From Swiss-Prot:
This is BAG family molecular chaperone regulator 8, chloroplastic. It comes from Arabidopsis thaliana. Co-chaperone that regulates diverse cellular pathways, such as programmed cell death and stress responses. The keyword Plastid applies. One of its GO terms (molecular function) is calmodulin binding.
Length: 551
């Protein structure tokens, strides 16, 4: 305000000097002084002049001023009056000056503010760049941490899957001497490859887990390889002396056929153990050759193995004590052999011999050996037989025969009890000393060749039909009665194709069954059988049921 007032005062003074120079000088005379002592009243519209005049009139008596002073005051008053009038009529220069000053100051302030703002912006940009870079670095490290953690989680998941597969594979093999070696070895190798595929930056925990799991897998693969070597050596040792029709079978003996043996024991092949009897009492009588021998045979336990090929047909049978032999000139089997599978189809007879052998002979010049697929239950007993692979061999003398249409499937023994799954008409079981036991079975087959019913001579049916009689033993030209020991077993329940069945246990017969009657001029015989059961060391005879006569 002081500067503004000073500026205004200077401006008024300059205007007053200019006006004083332009106006003529008044004469300083007494008349002028008189006139000045009695001034005319100011106009009503001029308030300023009126105030000045009033002030002068009030102080006229008190102060006496000279003429010059009064003239100067009067000139000042007049100049002020003129200035006011000019301000009313003309655009005010004062306002313009003030506005210009204000505008200039505003410009100065803006320029200073712009400089300060530019400096602040530069400083702010510098600080924001550092903050952004720091945030960028933090985000980068955090994202890399998330990536590494996700990789670790994925590797942990893969390790868990590999370990679960390994434990499942190990549990399926543990406690078993025989298993598909190639399948297990290939699966273990695949697990090792999957374990090796876990690479890159690995967490220490994952690294230690991977190391331990790899060590376990390598040990398991070595164990499987050792089992394969042991089994292969056992098979070669057991089959070194085996001959079929004067030739060594495939898969035994020669190095050129080792690959075929391994191919047979491939992924789909199986080795099935079959346990034999510990003790067995054999009651024998006259066979067709007329030899009658009675006695006891004590047989040590023997473990046998049956190897099934891809088509589930029996391709190898071997044990751990004796070799398998088969001669084209003699179809009989040694006393220590036992027949696993006996089959016959369309007038051709077949046999696959192992231990405690079974001999089936016919009247043809050739026999057809049919290998049946054998399925065993948990106890090592036969539960299913199927398949029809043929093998032509030459036959020898036909002392004993099985009629056309018969099919002898399986004979097995367990713990002194005779088990027979299914037979066609009869099977000759030969032990040591030429003793024979005849077992007669009636078998019904379905369309697929599977057995769905098997039964024998039970107390409910004491007489066998003529067809079974002709099958069981007709001998032309021989009128003598022969004491044949016929064992009859009843199978009350035979399951279907996909079910395993358990056969009823029957006790052995210790004495001969009497065979009496001969019919007709043709020499056919009707055999009436009597069962002799051995219970608690005493003989109990069950007579046949009486025949019902139709009216």
């Amino acid at each position: 305000m002081a500067s503004h007032h000073h500026h205004n005062h200077n401006h008024v003074c300059s205007r007053h000097q200019n006006h004083h120079n332009n106006t003529p000088q008044f004469a300083t005379s007494p008349n002028c002084c008189n006139k000045s002592n009695h001034p005319s009243p100011p106009p009503a519209e001029d308030n300023l002049l009126h105030l000045v005049a009033t002030y002068l009139q009030n102080h006229q008596q008190e102060t006496q001023c000279s003429c010059e002073t009064s003239c100067q005051n009067f000139n000042v008053i007049r100049s002020q009056n003129r200035v006011l009038r000019q301000h009313k009529n003309v655009p005010r220069e004062y306002d313009q000056v003030v506005l210009s000053c204000l505008l200039r100051k505003i410009d100065d302030l803006e320029s200073s503010l712009n400089k300060f703002s530019s400096f602040y912006d530069k400083r702010r940009d510098r600080h924001s760049t550092l903050r952004d870079s720091a945030a960028r670095v933090i985000q980068t490290h955090f994202r890399s941490y998330l990536v590494h953690r996700s990789i670790s989680f994925r590797q942990l998941k893969e390790l868990a899957m590999i370990k679960a597969s390994f434990l499942s594979l190990k549990s399926s093999v543990s406690g078993k001497l025989i298993f598909p070696f190639k399948v297990v070895s290939r699966k273990a190798t695949d697990l090792l490859l999957q374990l090796d595929s876990i690479q890159g930056r690995i967490d220490p925990m994952i690294r230690s887990s991977k190391r331990s799991l790899s060590r376990d897998l390598v040990r398991f693969v070595q164990y499987v390889d050792d089992c394969v070597v042991k089994r292969y050596g056992f098979v070669v040792k057991s089959g070194s002396g085996i001959k079929l029709n004067g030739k060594k079978p495939q898969g035994f003996g020669t190095s050129s056929e080792d690959e075929d043996n391994n191919a047979d024991m491939s992924d789909d092949s199986e080795e099935v153990p079959v346990s034999s009897i510990d003790k067995r009492k054999v009651a024998s009588s006259k066979s067709r050759t007329g030899v009658v021998i009675e006695g006891d045979v004590v047989k040590p336990p023997v473990m046998k193995f049956v190897v099934l090929d891809k088509n589930r047909n029996v391709c190898q049978v071997y044990g751990n004590r004796h070799d398998l032999t088969s001669s084209a000139e003699d179809d009989s089997v040694d006393g220590d052999e036992e027949t696993l599978v006996m089959s016959r189809d369309n007038g051709r007879k077949q046999s696959l011999k192992a231990r405690n052998g079974v001999s089936v002979k016919g009247g043809g010049g050739k026999t057809t050996r049919v290998v049946k697929t054998v399925s065993f239950d948990e106890n090592g007993n036969v539960c299913k037989v199927y398949g029809d692979t043929h093998d032509l061999t030459s036959s020898a003398e036909d002392d004993d025969s099985v009629d056309v249409g018969e099919e002898t499937l399986v004979m097995c023994r367990d713990e002194g009890k005779r088990r027979s799954s299914k037979t066609g008409s009869r099977v000759l079981v030969k032990g040591s000393g030429g003793k024979t036991n005849r077992v007669v079975k009636t078998v019904s087959f379905d369309e697929n060749g599977n057995v769905y019913k098997a039964y024998g001579d039970t107390p409910e049916s004491s007489i066998i039909s003529e067809e079974d009689d002709s099958t069981s033993g007709s001998n032309e030209g021989n009128g003598e009665e022969k004491g044949n020991v016929n064992e009859v077993e009843e199978i009350k329940y035979v399951p279907k194709e996909n079910e395993s069945f358990e056969e009823e246990e029957e006790k052995e017969t210790d004495s001969e069954n009497e065979v009496s009657s001969s019919e007709g001029s043709e020499g056919d015989k009707r055999v009436t059988k009597k069962e002799v059961q051995h219970q608690k060391g005493s003989l109990m005879f069950s007579p046949p049921l009486p025949l019902k006569m139709e009216p």
